Structures are given as C-alpha cells and as structure tokens.
Regions:
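C-terminal, non-catalytic tails of nucleotide-sugar-dependent glycosyltransferases
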Residues: 1-18, 204-258
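Short, acidic, metal-binding catalytic loop of nucleotide-sugar glycosyltransferases
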Residues: 15-19, 38-51
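Glycine-rich, basic loop-to-helix element that forms the pyrophosphate-binding segment
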Residues: 58-72
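Short beta-strand-to-loop acidic/aromatic patch adjacent to the donor-nucleotide binding site
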Residues: 74-87
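Conserved donor NDP-sugar-binding/catalytic core segment of glycosyltransferases
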Residues: 85, 90-123
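A recurrent flexible, glycine/aromatic-enriched loop bordering the glycosyltransferase active site
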Residues: 121-146, 150
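A short, conserved alpha-helix in the catalytic core of glycosyltransferases
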Residues: 150, 161-187, 192, 222
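Active-site donor/metal-binding and catalytic loop motifs
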Residues: 185-208, 241-244
Length: 259
C-alpha cells in the first residue's frame, strides 16, 4: 500500500481532555527517525486527537486525499506537506483552531519562519489569497488547517478527477469557490527550506520538460476551476482588438524581503 496505515492514538496522559481534541494530523513519513521530533510536538498538544503518517504519495495525489478523508474523525485536519522536522510556535495549533472556529473558515494558512541548510532563520510573511489567486505555486506554506467536512465534500464530488500531482491544488480551488483560504498573519511555525534557488529561477520550473506531466495536471485543474466560476475564455472566443498608434510603458514597484 502506498500509504502507511500507521496511526498514533494519543494516551490519556498526553490528552488533557479528549473532548477538546479537534484536530487530526497527517504528516509525511520516511522513517521513524525523520518523524520523531514532529511527532513528539504533536503528541504533547491537547488539540490533537490522532496523528497519521503518509507514505510515498503526498497530498497531490487524489487517492491520498481520499485516504485522509476516510480516516479523519476530528473537526479539522492538519496537513503538513514537508518531510523536514516541523517546529511549531507557542500555542500555534490553539491559535489556528481558534481563528478557524471564530472565522468559520474552511482552510487556513499562516506566516512562518524558514531555516536554510546553513542555519539562517528568516521570516516568511505571506499574502492574502484573492479570488484571482489561481497560480498552483501560490505560497501557502507547509502547514494547512482544513475543515474535515469540506474535504469530504470535495472527495464526494461526482466529477472528481484523479490526479497524481494536482489534487491539493484542485482542493484549494474547490474551497475558494465557497470561501477563500484565510491567511493568518502570525508567525506560527518554522519550516526547513531545502530549495535555496533565487525566486527568479524557481518561477520557470513549469517549463522544465521533467515537470511536463505535473504541469499538464495543474493546467487541467485550473481550466476546470475557471469553467466552474464562468471565467474560462477559449482562445478563439474573443474579437481581435485593433492596434493603437500610441505605446505606453507600465512600471510596477514592489518590495521583496528576499532576492
């Protein structure tokens, strides 16, 4: 089986009140040593009810999301998308859970810190998700909090497509048609960043022939979303615009914390 069926049921010693446990956590697994520190943090958090390990296929695979939806029993699902150790901030899960309940949001993501292989720790402030935020590489970070009910609704779709790479992206677009993912502007965790390339290099990964299969899936998911919101425009469905005699230059100013 491509998914580990191993789950950690928290003991009474680590759960102060089982009635208050409202999060099931799903983290990628490669070895017991790799998940040890992350597992220890989660087991000590009273908000956590169960911890499940994902093996081999990640949340980009539709079957993985189906597996998660079948096993999640708590009100919310915490999805961690990296193999590196997750370092949660002080009461991070409490903050996420409180904001989720107060705002009635379906999906939340938060600002965080990143640590590069050389040990440098830097803040990673994110931006709010807008209706037009349809890029598959829109930065959400590696920690996502989802309402379990909306994940089950997504899986229960009659026209659910089977993806190898684009399932989590498709889920985000599905949720955005109901309620935009909520940006929590608090630095709630620290993640390790192994890809230290400049942002100008990363943004062209989609044209790399090695990523062709992945990119085609992302395009299909995006096209389905645009059709669902009546925003899809076929290439031959518009009138040709006459050229004007004047030329205008447009300058955009921006501020970036990173090169």
């Amino acid at each position: 089986m491509w998914l580990s069926k191993k789950a950690v049921n928290l003991s009474e010693e680590t759960k102060t009140d089982s009635m208050k446990a409202k999060i099931d956590c799903f983290i990628p697994w490669q070895s017991d040593e790799q998940v040890a520190t992350t597992l220890q943090q989660l087991r000590q958090d009273a908000n956590v009810e169960e911890i499940h390990f994902l093996k081999e296929d990640g949340p980009g695979n539709t079957q993985t999301l189906q597996w998660i939806a079948q096993r999640a029993q708590a009100d919310y699902v915490l999805l961690y998308t990296k193999y590196d150790t997750l370092q949660l901030g002080y009461h991070a899960l409490t903050r996420l859970l409180t904001i989720a309940q107060d705002s009635d949001s379906l999906m939340l993501y938060a600002d965080h810190y990143i640590v590069t292989p050389d040990g440098t720790r830097s803040p990673m402030p994110l931006i709010d998700c807008q209706l037009g935020s349809v890029r598959d590489d829109f930065q959400l970070g590696s920690v996502l909090l989802l309402r379990t009910s909306v994940l089950r609704e997504y899986i229960a779709q009659e026209n659910l497509h089977s993806y190898h790479y684009a399932a989590l992206y498709d889920l985000r677009l599905f949720i955005s048609r109901r309620c935009l993912p909520l940006h929590v502007d608090e630095f709630l965790y620290t993640e390790v960043e192994q890809d230290t390339r400049l942002s100008g290099q990363k943004q062209f990964d989609y044209v790399d022939p090695r990523n062709r299969s992945r990119q085609l899936e992302m395009e299909r998911a995006c096209t389905r979303h645009l059709r669902a919101i009546n925003a899809y425009l076929h290439g031959d469905e518009y009138d040709e615009v006459k050229l004007h005699n004047c030329i205008q230059s447009l300058f955009l100013s921006y501020h970036s914390l990173y090169p």
